[in-house]
Amino acid sequence: MWIRARSTPAEAVTGLCRRVVLLLCSLALWARPGEAQRPLTVQGTRSLTFGSLLSGVNKSVLRSDAINGGQLDISGPKSVQVLLTFTLPASMTGPVGATLPLSFGSTDGGWSPPQQVGTQIAFDPRLPFTAPLDQNGKVSVYLGGTAKPTANQKAGSYTGTITLTVVVLP
């Protein structure tokens, strides 16, 4: 069964999975006494999107996918380390409470200097990870994953929430 993703509520419900929405929460900022610090900001640049899926056929999105891979841009104090902790869902929720299983592997997370998707360094998004902010106080974080629709997956749009907690380390 071919299933197509729905882009807007006005379109006919013929889709299965649209996207996992990247939401940001729990930002903490460490500051040295007596020093002015740039505030820590996180911008969700691109949501992790699975698009059209076939029932019973897994679909992986690479973290390096410049269209469908998730991207967050972090700004803060110059040349410091930040602790990144993702809260990843086991599934997305769709029509009438239907769920669509997700999985995230050991190389589905990546980081690089800002906006340099091609020079990412992989990390396991299931585990806390330390990444450096560059001399300008910036880093980009990327996320891929796998949607695992069942053979009898209910058609419709599915969404989920991914939370990234960022802490500036002393």
Predicted regions and their residues:
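Bacterial N-terminal signal peptides
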Residues: R19-W30
